Amino acid sequence: MRIKMVSAYDRAEEVSKLFKEYTDMLIENDSSFQKYLDIQNYSEEIEHLESKYGLPDGRLYLVYCDEELAGCIGLRKIDSQNCEMKRLYVRPEFRGRKIGNLLVEKIIDDAKEIGYSHMLLDTLPFLKSAIHMYKKYGFYAISSYNDSPMDTSIYMKLDL
């Protein structure tokens, strides 16, 4: 198994494909998630990836497993001290191979290198394996930090 991680800024079509799979999965498990996407101006995000995830304050990666598109992750600036992990997604056929771990480790390392003090994220209760992984890396539960309309959202923070 050969894994390769690449910067995704010039691969908008592949990013869009993975983001769509990710959001479709979330909506399938909780139809109210569509309202959250609308609040986040999700359609704008896809069209302007660099404005949300651009260098020097953000990151956007794709990962390939044996040359097949396997997953993605993003990092966006909230303010000078805080960043947010976004759009962690590993395609179902590639899960269980520690690809999610590689993506999370990379984005944490990048956040430290940029100089952020804290990384935030929000997730949903049915993403149990992701929540377990976040806790393994030191994330802990916090109160809401964004305008999510999702009553079930779980908010987490990592002190970098």
Give a label for each model feature:
Residues V90, G96-D109, K136:
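Conserved acetyl-CoA-binding loop-helix of GNAT-fold acetyltransferases
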